[in-house]
């Protein structure tokens, strides 16, 4: 099974080798026919501490690295 890849924006880089990435998805409500935006935060591994708040990044699924980290940053 291929690993999922998501696009998002770094919202926090306070922890060592970890960034928090906010990923937004858009969908049409089935009844209201209105476009709705929802966002979800993922904690991702950043080995070189290269990414700062506001950077656009791509994250990919990986094996669990800690209790909450299951993603790694692959590009910006």
From Swiss-Prot:
It holds the Pfam family Ribosomal_S17. Keywords: Ribonucleoprotein, Ribosomal protein, RNA-binding, rRNA-binding. The keyword Ribosomal protein applies. GO terms for cellular component: cytosolic small ribosomal subunit. The keyword rRNA-binding applies. SUPFAM superfamilies: Nucleic acid-binding proteins (SSF50249). One of its GO terms (biological process) is translation. GO terms for molecular function: rRNA binding; structural constituent of ribosome. It comes from the Bacteria. Belongs to the universal ribosomal protein uS17 family. PANTHER family: 40S RIBOSOMAL PROTEIN S11 FAMILY MEMBER, SMALL RIBOSOMAL SUBUNIT PROTEIN US17M. NCBIfam families: PRK05610.1 (NF004123), uS17_bact (TIGR03635). One of the primary rRNA binding proteins, it binds specifically to the 5'-end of 16S ribosomal RNA. Part of the 30S ribosomal subunit. This is Small ribosomal subunit protein uS17. The lineage of its organism: Bacteria, Pseudomonadati, Pseudomonadota, Alphaproteobacteria, Rhodobacterales.
């Amino acid at each position: 099974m291929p690993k999922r890849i998501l696009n998002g924006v770094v919202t926090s880089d306070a922890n060592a080798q970890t960034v928090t990435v906010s990923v937004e998805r858009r969908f049409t409500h089935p009844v209201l026919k209105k476009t709705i935006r929802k966002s979800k935060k993922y904690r991702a591994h950043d080995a070189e501490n290269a990414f700062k708040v506001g950077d656009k990044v791509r994250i990919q699924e990986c094996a669990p690295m800690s209790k909450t980290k299951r993603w790694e940053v692959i590009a910006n």
